[in-house]
Amino acid sequence: MKNSNKFTRRNFLATTATAAAGFSIVPSNVIAGLGHKAPSDKLNIAGVGVGGMGRGNLRNMKSENIVALCDVDWAHSDRCFKDFPDAKKFWDWRKMYDEMGKSIDAIMVATADHSHGIVAAHAMTLGKHVYVQKPLTHTVYESRLLTKLADKHKVATSMGNQGSSAEGVRLIQEWLWNDEIGEVTKVEAFTDRPLWPQGLAKPAEGMPVPETMNWDLFIGPAKFRPYHRMYTPWNFRGWWDFGTGALGDMACHILHPVFMGLKLGYPTRVQGSSTDVMTDSAPNTEIVKLVFPARPKAAESKINFPEVEVTWMDGGIQPMKPIGWPEGKSMNDDGGGVIFHGTKDKIICGCYGVRPWLLSGREPKVQKTIPRIKDSHEQDWIRACKESPENRTETASPFSQAGPFNEMVVMGVLAVRLQGLEKELLWDGPKMEFTNIRDREELKFCLDTGLKIVDGHPSFSRKYTDPVSAKEFAADLIKHNYREGWSLPAMP
């Protein structure tokens, strides 16, 4: 494997402005003139993280020129490389930006969660349109940063929560705003995930790094640890340093109609509860409560938006079925579900907002007021990329909306990881800080449950970390201290 680690952050910043002068690929904005592109013009798109979801995203973008592919695991990415044999291959996205930055119009990001923010942020500072898989970022701060960078650089953006482009989310919003179920003060949501391992202790020993992988680049901004096949591919979702557990993986799909339909902003109170809170791995099962204050009544809505409590569940548990639930009907629809508890009725939908229905059995007759997406989620982003900022119709999940929404999602992760404080946490959204964690408070986390069964009798010998400052730990969860050599652009 070629060693690409010599390409440093310093090299990237020093050379980006003058890179790629010798390449023959010309970005379509140069051909098209002042930023607006005819629909027939093709974008030059690069993919970062192309072995899993990224491959599917790029296949839905094959109407355009896929000019570069970047991944840290070339064995896992081989199928995508074969899909686009003319695309130049890279290990390091920084080197790709350096060498081909001026030749690329747009970036698709589908790395492990912990790298979403840094890859997308630097792409936008270069003026690139970005499509980022869910969850949008690993932290609250990264979400806020991407929101502001998108606004500053006027690029087309989309998070990869494809249900936001579908019919169900729009119907739910229209039903809510038309007063079909009354005011909503309670929402319950769940997923049947995780499908990957969680609740694990960190492997005691590392393994040799495969020749087809650059492990240092996979680690990226996270704290370094030895390679183990338990971490990637796919399983990164269950490890805190790389993923956000079942909540982060699925709430961007399942809670989207909640965020949009109830016009949510920052939560002000949060709590989490789960099975063992391990140091390195997300729990097998968790419950999170987020409380949002009353919001102003919107012009398009007949209802008020009072304080609302949103409860999330995962790991196999579901809300209790309300009175009137059809006997024998599963609540799990396509991997999860939501119940909007209104003062007059209830809306139930599946994951991605699919197949909404009213508990009463009534079928709402509501005028369609929200524009519908006629093409795929990815193609709608491509459409937005080709429109000038002044005349652009936003995508179904632009960062102006996906950024604040993702802050809500990863706030649930914070609630779970801080549950050892044994209290409801108070959140100041604009300042991105908890207001009721005191300087002297400490936390400790389980390293190993030490479960043993001897003669049919179970025993536990749990091992814990040394106590850490709760305030410092929370601050790092909100805004990570990146590994040396890795950094984000400044907050606008």
Task: Describe the function of each predicted region.
Residues 2-20:
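N-terminal secretory signal peptides and thylakoid transit peptides that target proteins
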Residues 16-84, 163-166, 258:
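N-terminal Rossmann-like dinucleotide-binding module
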Residues 88-92:
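Short acidic-hydrophobic, aromatic-tinged amphipathic segments that line or gate anion-handling sites
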Residues 32, 49, 53, 57, ...:
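Predominantly a Rossmann-like dinucleotide-binding segment in NAD(P)-dependent oxidoreductases
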Residues 95-102:
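Short amphipathic alpha-helix with an adjacent loop that forms part of the alpha/beta core around
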Residues 112, 117-165, 179:
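Beta-strand-loop-alpha-helix segment that lines the small-molecule cofactor/substrate pocket
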Residues 107-108:
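N-terminal Rossmann-like NAD(P) cofactor-binding module of classical short-chain dehydrogenase/reductase
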Residues 36, 56-58, 62, 70, ...:
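Glycine-enriched catalytic-core subsegment of oxygenase/oxidase enzymes
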